[in-house]
Amino acid sequence: MPKLRSATTTHGRNMAGARALWRATGMTDEDFGKPIIAVVNSFTQFVPGHVHLKDLGQLVAREIEAAGGVAKEFNTIAVDDGIAMGHGGMLYSLPSRELIADSVEYMVNAHCADAMVCISNCDKITPGMLMAALRINIPVIFVSGGPMEAGKTKLSDQIIKLDLVDAMIQGADPKVSDAQSEQVERSACPTCGSCSGMFTANSMNCLTEALGLSQPGNGSMLATHADREQLFKLAGQRIVTLAKRYYQQDDESALPRNIATKAAFENAMALDIAMGGSTNTVLHLLAAAQEAGVDFTMADIDRMSRKVPQLCKVAPSTQKYHMEDVHRAGGVVAILGQLEKAGLVHGDTRTVLGGSLAELLNEYDVSRQPSQEVVDFYRAGPAGIRTTKAFSQDCRWPELDVDRAEGCIRSLEHAYSLEGGLAVLSGNLALDGAIVKTAGVDDEHLCFRGPARVFESQDTAVAGILDGTVKAGEVVVIRYEGPKGGPGMQEMLYPTTYLKSMGLGKQCALITDGRFSGGTSGLSIGHVSPEAASGGTIGLVADGDIININIPARSMVLEVADSVLAARRVAVEARGWKPLDRQRQVSFALRAYAMLATSADKGAVRDRSKLEE
């Protein structure tokens, strides 16, 4: 029978000092011997996805204590990628994932916590906490802050839905008036919550459901809706049950590594492909798998991308649907239900609810025979009222969207595409692979061949797009923006947004060893590995070189003779794999991150071989 980790600090005469300090936090004699549950919050006033989390940690804590546990809350940092984007702040976004993972490990292990509830929401916070949870391997439940309501405004006598990306595109389009741009800006982000489309934050919160580590509705129930409060309360109750199963019943199935197995990672990837999730999820799943000791690689993703269909299309791939519409159609469970019918997910994986995924689908899939309680849960909808408060409204859709032929979530027979929303490309330009979000690429652009226009940084690329240097038909190459070369692997949302603003969104392709926001659409290929700073071929591309992209064939080829590339490699190695004339201040903290960073095909995690020397 495993001993409570916290007993190290609460039992024995030699721990009198530790107990004295625990008493100073409010613990009593009756609390020593109960499981100590870390409530890992991420409240901050900097981030709309986290601005409403301040009191939610204590909401969970009260439920933990009522169920027989002891709750202790602490906070992690949280970076808003949208606010950090387009300037030096974006260098810190991906590295913050590692800091979050480490800070959770430090706090939980230093104080010998027995289990965790992770309250996350936005881009790097969920992945960072996920990495920590799988690293530490104690009982855990994830509960996110929930998605923002979609913005709405009236343009050209038509009410349209909006999000952050619309505000960026309108703001950069010289043909859009100041008044219209301001109108969109003021309407795009109306409430607290993670940005309203299938961007990175919402994608990751959906994937925790497929991994079995969060409850139904975690990824899709709006931040503002009263029904979301129940997810937080149940998380507090269920984590105590999980802790007791492990520590009192020696039930190792309650541990996250026995829930998030190889099969569960395949379920998560199948979901990601089917819903057209952010390419960043690939990076984070690879990183989490390494922490879990699961052999899940780019080869697995490539294999799955060829057989899993795209069943859902959500902003930024379409303006018609946002996360509130995904929830109305049954959320993650409904997508997984369609995949199960097609034999594309493993129904025998376990979840934090205690049963199998198949059992969960039978209870919560709105396409089956759900209870009225489940129906009402998925009818929860937006109120259209600007607010920063959680659980502040209880509006409901008049009916569910269960149209699997033309609705938000499709059946296999009516799939948007029989091949899914993400694809792995390879070739001499990306020997270890690259990722493209095919859900955001029009069919006529799946093949593209053109001359390279090379930039040594995102900043020079943005300038080149806006000043007309970039021409229709070119392949924009942005290099030295990978995990090591950036450092920090910046998101390239501004270059892709400005290509659209300049009328080049469907006239150019973009290739980078950096990454893309979940808000990116169009022929945007990221995560090129090896990155330029690690000697990747992308560091050898010259202006005018022909690049041939063929997504159906999963290939990306630089049409330059091997002898020419070999000569270029000698020249670059002589000067070092560094950008030419890049004006960028890189802090000591970022340099330290870069020293251990691996390329994207490894999840941009630390190079463990360097730590084991």
From Swiss-Prot:
GO terms for cellular component: cytosol. GO terms for biological process: isoleucine biosynthetic process; L-valine biosynthetic process. [2Fe-2S] cluster binds at C122, C195. It catalyses: (2R)-2,3-dihydroxy-3-methylbutanoate = 3-methyl-2-oxobutanoate + H2O; (2R,3R)-2,3-dihydroxy-3-methylpentanoate = (S)-3-methyl-2-oxopentanoate + H2O. Its EC number is 4.2.1.9. The active site is at S517. Its cofactor is [2Fe-2S] cluster; Mg(2+). Keywords: 2Fe-2S, Amino-acid biosynthesis, Branched-chain amino acid biosynthesis, Iron, Iron-sulfur, Lyase, Magnesium, Metal-binding. The modification N6-carboxylysine is found at K124. One of its GO terms (molecular function) is dihydroxy-acid dehydratase activity. HAMAP family: IlvD (MF_00012). Homodimer. This is Dihydroxy-acid dehydratase.
